[in-house]
UniProtKB/Swiss-Prot annotation:
Name recorded for this polypeptide: Serpin-Z3
Annotated organism of origin: Arabidopsis thaliana (Mouse-ear cress)
Top-level division of the source organism's lineage: Eukaryota
Feature type site, description Reactive bond: 351-352
Upper taxonomic lineage: Eukaryota, Viridiplantae, Streptophyta, Embryophyta, Tracheophyta
Family annotation (InterPro entries): Serpin_CS, Serpin_dom, Serpin_fam, Serpin_sf, Serpin_sf_1, Serpin_sf_2
Length: 389
């Protein structure tokens, strides 16, 4: 399978995953952001350390022929960047293993050589809070301070889970980029944003009257806002339904129409009468393992010992399974550009227009941050209420 086709397949999975996550949390009126790339990398690591049956289930879920393909997707955008102050994409991988166990040589080699992962031996059983602090410090460092806590030291369930663990795998993604055309902060003004319940909130909207990458489709518009470039081309995409309550129908279309995210891309700038999009600054956290299980990916999470290629342990190395995958992401969008970060942690336990169009994002919409050369989606989410941080 060609790499491009593999990425397109993964983007179809991304769309279905986004729908599942949003359906899970939409009743709470949540803004949503997460990094499918971060989750995919973690699943790739788990696949590499699994028995053949579990590995095949993960690859089938991700619609990828091999873990090599998954690694190539990440390498496509993680490498090749140039040093510039207004564009940064960094990924990091961390591993914490109990002092009573050790990594199998082949898995250790993969972690260190392919993923450049940092590995630490810790005492899960008697020092769970110290382990939690160490993981949180790692997340803080590798997200430039955007995510200071991924595991809670005040949650008794988390402490119990850590105490009974053998291995923790973590992946972090940090992205910061300036717009290729920055917004004029003097034009930013408060306006009404229409909520799904019919109420409105006043939030600051960025404005522009410049030509935009904008295209109208049946029932929705797509706006592409490019960032500054190096060898990679990153853009934010905003998918805005025409109807103020049209988000659910648009989400259904995105998740059921194969290739949607790769085929609805504005390629040409067009004059606009007005562009207004709200400033954003919010975070979102969810238990990715529960969503993945609901979508049919169950083998890594059963206590049958399917992760046989990761750890040698005198007592339970052959009974390792994923207890949970926790994912947290945050995003900030302002006149200068976008800053976003995400951390995934897996805890292992034994057992057409006649006039110049407007683009006014004053009601709930979907968004992605995408690398356009490869098609890889770094972040995806929804905005229901920009006033919520």
């Amino acid at each position: 399978m060609e790499l491009g086709k593999s990425i397109e397949n993964q983007n179809n999975v991304v769309a279905r995953l986004a729908k599942k996550v949003i359906e899970t949390d939409v009743a709470n009126g949540s803004n949503v952001v997460f990094s499918p790339m971060s989750i995919n990398v973690l699943l790739s690591l788990i696949a590499a350390g699994s028995n053949p049956v579990t590995k095949e289930e993960i690859l089938s879920f991700l619609m990828s022929p091999s873990t090599d393909h998954l690694n190539a997707v990440l390498a496509k955008i993680a490498d090749g960047g140039t040093e510039r102050s207004d564009l940064c994409l960094s990924t990091a991988h961390g591993v914490w293993i109990d002092k009573s166990s050790y990594l199998k040589p082949s898995f250790k080699e993969l972690l260190e050589n392919s993923y450049k992962a940092s590995c630490s031996q810790v005492d899960f059983a008697t020092k769970p809070v110290e382990v939690i602090d160490e993981v949180n410090i790692w997340a803080d460092v590798h997200t430039n301070g955007l995510i200071k806590q991924i595991l809670s030291r005040d949650c008794t369930d988390t402490i119990k889970e850590i105490r009974n663990s053998t291995l923790i795998l973590a992946n972090a993604v940090y992205f910061k980029a300036a717009w290729s055309r920055k917004f004029d902060a003097k034009l930013t003004k408060d306006n009404d944003f229409h909520l799904l319940d019919g109420n409105t909130v006043k939030v600051p909207f960025m404005m522009s009257y410049k030509d935009q990458y904008l295209r109208g489709y049946d029932g929705f518009q797509v706006l592409r806002l490019p960032y500054v470039e190096d060898k990679r081309h990153f853009s934010m995409y905003i998918y805005l339904p025409n109807d103020k309550d049209g988000l659910a129908a648009l989400l259904e279309k995105i998740s059921t129409e194969p290739g949607f995210l790769d085929s609805h891309i504005p390629l040409h700038r067009t004059p606009v009468d007005a562009l207004r999009i709200p400033k954003l600054n919010f975070s979102f956290e969810f238990k990715a393992s529960e969503v993945l299980k609901d979508m049919g990916l169950t083998s890594p999470f059963t206590s049958k010992g399917n992760l046989t290629e990761m750890v040698d342990s005198p007592s339970n190395g052959d009974k390792l399974h994923v207890s949970s995958i926790i994912h947290k992401a945050c995003i900030e969008v302002d006149e200068e550009g976008t800053e976003a970060a995400a951390v995934s942690v897996a805890i292992m336990m034994p057992q057409c227009l006649m006039r110049n169009p407007d683009f006014v994002a004053d009601h709930p919409f979907l968004f992605t941050v995408r690398e356009d050369n490869s098609g890889v989606i770094l972040f995806i989410g929804q905005v229901l209420d920009p006033s919520k941080h």
